[in-house]
């Protein structure tokens, strides 16, 4: 569950740690930095060339913008390439000839990026360096706390928070408490999460939408649907109104809890906004529909699937759709997804999925399709089961295809499943249904020989 919270929390983390305050003419800055960034990206992995370009064309970043805005903008633009952004900071820390010290915001940004790069040691080193230079501002503390949050280090985060509270030159902010709420929520430490929220209120720092969103996400991760709903209703009543992130969280929460009516109501509220980042939400709704047999669920799911067009193949989603179509007896659609799974070399190892496929073929009387599927599934390493063979025996028997029925029995005898009482009972019933009493008696004789 904690991994799910990472996905939920990532959309808010930027709000917690973005400390840059660009000048009014930042548009020109962004354009100039973009040109430099593009040149740096063409260099590749040569650290020496990277540093040389900055030496020749990057001095203006901190000489013109002594508040750190230039370096911060370049690090922001290189943020997807964490190691390059950190190289910029390393170069900046080495520029000592101009007597322009790093700002606390540059340290905060470096700490944040080091955390995203999972380099906790570097983040702590930068924090300690800032401390030696008396630059331990709230943003620097918050950045290191967010590093611990991002990496699930609750004890370290709490220890740093206690140190933060002892400082006389700076004090925790609402961002600080948001981080605490987040880290506890991610680790299912609900009581600690609630205690952090209560302390925020005691120190009379007004919570913001991010605070409530992290609370909702924490309750959702812990599957505490009642408190999730109560927090949402509190937002609707209080001074902090729900934002887009809140509605998306609630949509996911309703989907995960199987509350389809509320999920659909929430989707109507935000469906025009579900687009660029629709994937996780849409997939959550698809999962919710797959778990409950509701009217028109196939049509609803296919409408949602149209929003995912162009996305990469997801094995788990494809298997989920195989089971859905099997349960609804949509054999053609089921086989389309099965073929896709074979093409993508997806290996199904759940008996429940196989039984759903078998049942669909049985209800639709598609024994030849079933036989073909079994051959392909066996070659692809899918998990076979005894029910699969029994279904083939039953279907061949119902169609008076006794030679093929007996062929399946012989095939089954050579597998690890072997022949059991039920196998013979199915054969006996098949023969009797068609008035072939003597053949049924022969099968009974075989049973006796096997001691069944």
UniProtKB/Swiss-Prot annotation:
PPR repeats lie at residues 137-171, 173-207, 208-242, 243-273, 350-384, 385-419, 420-452. The keyword Membrane does not apply. This is Pentatricopeptide repeat-containing protein At2g30780. It holds the Pfam family PPR. GO terms for molecular function: mRNA binding. NCBIfam families: PPR. It comes from Arabidopsis thaliana (Mouse-ear cress). Belongs to the PPR family. P subfamily. Keywords: Repeat. It comes from the Eukaryota.
């Amino acid at each position: 569950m904690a991994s799910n919270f990472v996905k939920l929390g990532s959309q808010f983390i930027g709000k917690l740690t973005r400390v840059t305050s660009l000048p009014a003419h930042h548009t020109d800055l962004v354009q100039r930095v973009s040109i430099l960034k593009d040149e740096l990206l063409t260099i590749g992995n040569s650290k020496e060339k990277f540093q040389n370009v900055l030496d020749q064309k990057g001095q203006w970043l901190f000489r013109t913008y002594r508040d750190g805005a230039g370096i911060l903008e370049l690090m922001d633009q290189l943020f997807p390439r964490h190691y390059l952004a950190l190289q910029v900071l390393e170069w900046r820390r080495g520029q000592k000839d101009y007597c322009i010290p790093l700002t606390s915001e540059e340290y905060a940004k470096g700490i944040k990026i080091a955390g995203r790069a999972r380099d906790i040691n570097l983040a702590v080193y930068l924090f300690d360096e800032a401390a030696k230079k008396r630059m331990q501002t709230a943003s620097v503390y918050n950045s290191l706390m967010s590093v611990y949050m991002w990496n699930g280090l609750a004890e370290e985060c709490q220890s740093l928070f206690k140190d933060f509270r002892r400082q006389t030159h700076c004090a925790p902010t609402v961002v600080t408490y948001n981080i605490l709420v987040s880290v506890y929520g991610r680790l299912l430490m609900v009581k600690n999460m609630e205690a952090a929220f209560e302390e925020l209120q005691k120190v009379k720092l007004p919570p913001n939408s991010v605070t409530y969103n992290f609370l909702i996400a924490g309750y959702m991760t812990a599957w505490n649907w009642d408190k999730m709903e109560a927090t949402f209703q509190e937002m609707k009543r209080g001074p902090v109104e729900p934002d887009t992130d809140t509605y998306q969280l609630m949509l996911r929460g309703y989907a995960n809890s199987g509350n389809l009516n509320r999920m659909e109501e929430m989707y109507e509220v935000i469906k025009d906004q579900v687009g660029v980042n629709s994937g996780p939400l849409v997939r959550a709704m698809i999962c919710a529909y797959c778990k409950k047999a509701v009217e028109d669920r196939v049509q609803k799911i296919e409408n949602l699937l149209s929003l995912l067009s162009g996305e990469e193949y997801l094995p788990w989603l494809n298997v989920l759709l195989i089971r859905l179509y099997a349960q609804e007896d949509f054999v053609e659609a089921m086989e389309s997804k099965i073929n896709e799974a074979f093409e993508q070399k997806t290996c199904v190892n759940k008996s429940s999925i196989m039984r759903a496929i078998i049942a669909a073929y049985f209800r639709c009387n598609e024994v030849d399709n079933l036989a073909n599927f079994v051959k392909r599934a066996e070659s692809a390493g899918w998990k076979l089961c005894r029910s699969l063979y029994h279904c083939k025996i039953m279907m061949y028997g119902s169609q008076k295809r006794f030679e093929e029925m007996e062929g399946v029995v012989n095939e089954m005898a050579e597998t690890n499943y072997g022949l059991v009482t039920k196998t013979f009972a199915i054969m006996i019933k098949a023969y009797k249904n068609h008035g072939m009493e003597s053949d049924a008696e022969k099968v009974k004789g075989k049973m006796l020989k096997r001691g069944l």
